[in-house]
């Protein structure tokens, strides 16, 4: 299997980096091909705009969705986007490793979604969910939280489960583009987990990754037009 790891954390010595490294090692040892997009290390620009699609200044208002579709047809995406699109097209499996910030993912990762999972490449009019342009691929989030699992329930302070909080990413982004999305791996409350707890999360991640082929995706839904 060909796996693309998309990593979004500014600190190369972070626990997220340990999760990334363990994932890369486990997947490689299982015979999978692994590529990495380390967004901070790459200096990836998260700001989407006309320059992404070869639109010149002064040409008038740019509808980015339509411009992306045109760039996909003409092959005029900027070089940094083309490189990432090539990785996505190559991959069978997309593993996203990041912390949960502000009930979502880091801005640099959101920008990667905005720029790389572009119209005409990852989805199109009438080509979403089970008809998405990336159908046949699978994906999974691997995230860390600052707070414990007990905070993430309807009757708890956050008022929602983490699955509900991350729904815009798992369903509204990855599944929207056609991916079958596996259940999210969560390392809860990494600040308070202690060395033993953090070590156990690494073991649990390894077990999850070694069972990828046997893991059923989250319930999805189709698109009817």
Question: Which residue ranges define each predicted feature?
Answer:
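Short, conserved loop/helix-junction motifs that constitute active-site signature segments
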Residues: 131-136
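Residues at the starts of beta-strands that form the adenosine-phosphate
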Residues: 2, 33, 138-139, 180-181
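N-terminal beta1-alpha1-beta2 submodule of the flavodoxin-like/Rossmannoid cofactor-binding fold
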Residues: 1-121, 203-225
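A gly/proline- and charged-residue-enriched helix-loop-helix capping module
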Residues: 124-128
């Amino acid at each position: 299997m060909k796996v693309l790891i998309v990593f979004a954390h500014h600190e190369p010595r972070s626990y997220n980096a340990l999760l990334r490294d363990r994932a890369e090692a486990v997947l490689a040892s299982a015979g999978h091909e692994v590529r990495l997009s380390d967004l901070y290390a790459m200096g990836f620009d998260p700001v989407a705009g006309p320059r992404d699609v070869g639109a010149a200044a002064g040409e008038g208002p740019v509808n980015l969705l339509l411009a992306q579709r045109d760039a996909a047809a003409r092959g005029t995406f900027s070089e940094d986007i083309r490189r990432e699109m090539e990785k996505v097209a190559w991959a069978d499996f997309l593993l996203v490793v990041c912390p949960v910030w502000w009930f979502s993912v880091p801005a640099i990762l959101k920008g990667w979604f905005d720029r790389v999972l572009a119209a005409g490449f990852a989805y199109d009019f009438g080509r979403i969910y089970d008809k998405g342009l990336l159908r046949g691929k699978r994906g999974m989030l691997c995230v860390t939280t600052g707070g414990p699992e007990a905070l993430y329930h309807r009757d708890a302070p956050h008022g929602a489960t983490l699955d509900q909080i991350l729904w815009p990413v798992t369903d509204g982004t990855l599944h929207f583009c056609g991916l079958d999305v596996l259940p999210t791996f969560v390392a809860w409350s990494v600040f308070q987990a202690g060395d033993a707890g953090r070590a156990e999360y690494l073991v649990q991640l390894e077990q999850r990754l070694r069972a990828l082929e046997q893991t059923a995706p989250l319930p999805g839904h189709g698109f009817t037009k």
